[in-house]
Amino acid sequence: MSKKKREKGAGSTPATVQLEQAGVEFKTYEYEHSNDHMDDGYGIEAAKKLGFDEHQVFKTLMADTGSERVVGVVPVSGHMDLTALAAAVGAKKAAMADPKVAMRESGYVVGGISPLGQRTKHKTVLDESALQFDEILLSGGKRGFSVGLNPYDLLKVLDGITAPIGTW
């Protein structure tokens, strides 16, 4: 996979800046976000508009363990198992973080939250299903903008771990 040259007007986000600084190869994908697709969610919209399998496109969710907030990255086709996420980070339990907290700590809006370039660094757990792909897509830091990269590169950049945290 080769690094895509940014086209005029594509801009950058903290997510792409972090990838560039880490020297990681990635691609950028843009699509026109529409509120008409919100019954399915932002991630499903991205998968459909970009022509990718829903198991290959991942969403970023933030949870609170009581002592810290952690980030889970799971396929848009499923849900995050909060018990499995808590176990992966050595906590007893986890609950979804308030969206306002997630936006404040990540620096992104809901529907555009990326695990990359977050304002506050969090432990990150990637669902193990990502490892079957050479490239996964996730939010590039704004609605209608995704980045594609190798899941092992994502783990390296974020110092993340994998665990079976996705459910279908």
Predicted regions mapped to residue ranges:
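Extended, low-hydrophobicity, polar/charged segments
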Residues: 1-168
